[in-house]
Amino acid sequence: MLSSSPASCTSPSPDGENPCKKVHWASGRRRTSSTDSESKSHPDSSKIPRSRRPSRLTVKYDRGQLQRWLEMEQWVDAQVQELFQDQATPSEPEIDLEALMDLSTEEQKTQLEAILGNCPRPTEAFISELLSQLKKLRRLSRPQK
């Protein structure tokens, strides 16, 4: 593991900058793994096979579906902030849309009424609109491989 302490940096860099700052800056930009530090000790790292790191793998979701979920969550957050804006202590409840998707419509309504029970404003319009939006929203499917 690289150390950023001045005692461990003994050789000056050719461009005259402090090598400790370079090491610290480089380690702050990306995470290093054991394969990265091992490949740095070899002069030609291009010939060493690198294993795929799990953080580099990507998963494809349906972008339209993700966009609908994002818009729905933003709408819910905005509505909840509006409902609780008159409250002295800001304690906005969290509404888990995925958990609501698992429930029946009546259970969803009961759950939302319980969550929004201490709201200073009327919540019936918000609850009915959220329930109608949930019917249109599909659960996020498993990622495509």
From Swiss-Prot:
Family matches, as InterPro entries: CPI-17, CPI-17_sf
CC annotations in GO: cytoplasm
GO MF, any single term: protein serine/threonine phosphatase inhibitor activity
Comp. bias regions, Basic residues: 21-32
Keywords: Cytoplasm, Phosphoprotein, Protein phosphatase inhibitor
SUPFAM superfamilies associated with the record: Myosin phosphatase inhibitor 17kDa protein, CPI-17
Tissue expression pattern: Detected in colon, intestine, kidney and brain cortex.
Free-text description of this protein's post-translational modifications in UniProt: Phosphorylated on several residues.
Positions of the UniProt region annotated as Disordered: 1-59
Protein's cellular compartments: Cytoplasm
Skewed-composition ranges (Low complexity): 1-14
Consequence of substituting residue 25 to A: Reduces inhibitory activity by 13%
Interaction with protein phosphatase 1: region residues: 21-25
Its biological purpose: Inhibitor of PPP1CA. Has inhibitory activity only when phosphorylated, creating a molecular switch for regulating the phosphorylation status of PPP1CA substrates and smooth muscle contraction.
Protein name: Protein phosphatase 1 regulatory subunit 14D
Organism: Homo sapiens
Classification lineage: Eukaryota, Metazoa, Chordata, Craniata, Vertebrata
